[in-house]
From Swiss-Prot:
Residue ranges of the annotated DNA-binding region, renumbered to this chain: 258-277
Protein's gene: ant
GO-annotated molecular function: DNA binding
Name of this protein: Antirepressor protein 1
Lineage: Viruses, Duplodnaviria, Heunggongvirae, Uroviricota, Caudoviricetes
Task of the protein: Antagonist of the C1 repressor or repressor bypass function.
Protein's organism: Escherichia phage P1 (Bacteriophage P1)
Coiled-coil segments: none
Keywords, ordered alphabetically: DNA-binding
Key word DNA-binding present: yes
Amino acid sequence: MKKPLVTRNEIAEAIALHTACMPTREIPGAIANYFMITRRFYTRTDKAVINRLLIAEIRDYLIEQGRLRYATVAAEIRKEAHRMTGNNLNVEKTAPVTSATPAPAVNIIPNTGDTIDSQTLLKMVNEARKLCGEPEVRNNKFIEKILDELEGEFYTKSAKSHGTRAGRSFEVITMTYKQALRVAARESKAVRRSLIDKLEELQQANSPAPSIPQTLPEALRLAAELAEQKMQLEQQLVAAAPKVDFADRVSVANGILIGNFAKVVGLKQNALFSWLRQNGILMAFGARKNVPRQQYINAGYFTVKEVVLDDENGYQIRLTPN
């Protein structure tokens, strides 16, 4: 039996600690980002796949606990798939191509940052199969596998001519990368590993530059990526003057200035501090308000140093990439 990325007890503990004021539907994404950072999954080449697996495991846990309905989760997945394909595809299902009624060649929708066609995926599958000593798969069998995997979902089906051979054509399916990953998951373990890496690389090469996050879960996801860029940020995030807000008094030697981090990810500084307090990461009251709790300091996510600034006691807090 395959070992899960995180245990049910770890999921339960993370939800209890960090989602007190969060709507249930936002919990899977937020807790998945929490594990991506704390377990350093963001350093792996298949981090996008791991993030999706984490979300699925957390959703399953919430369904088991009665906090989410299966129908609600299924509706959200369908809505997400429709949104991803709707941005780039005029989605419709056409009648299957048959030899009795040859269909004219149709231009295949080109690959974008969100889509890939079955011919490109089939080529990648057969290259991986060849390297692993497995036989190649024919287009008709591959299309059957795709149709079975994507049953009830949105995708584009078209036809392409067999070169100069008149009257002969074959089906081509254009799908999202998320759907392609599920098709790839049907391959053997060795082939699957190679495919996932190649799909990730192809998607990143075709994806547009990331936009400023609009929600807190998106900001947490970006935090994992920013941790990898720490060395470049260190030179730019030096503390300014002594008489600035608490966050701007944080020195940056081995981490990220919390106030500047909020600006980088497009959040208001006070909103970020408020969320960290509400979720039990920072102290909420007293002289040590906004100071990280000891368990997060011990885990290496923050470093704290007590200093004196203009005859006032203060704290230097660094958000580390651990």
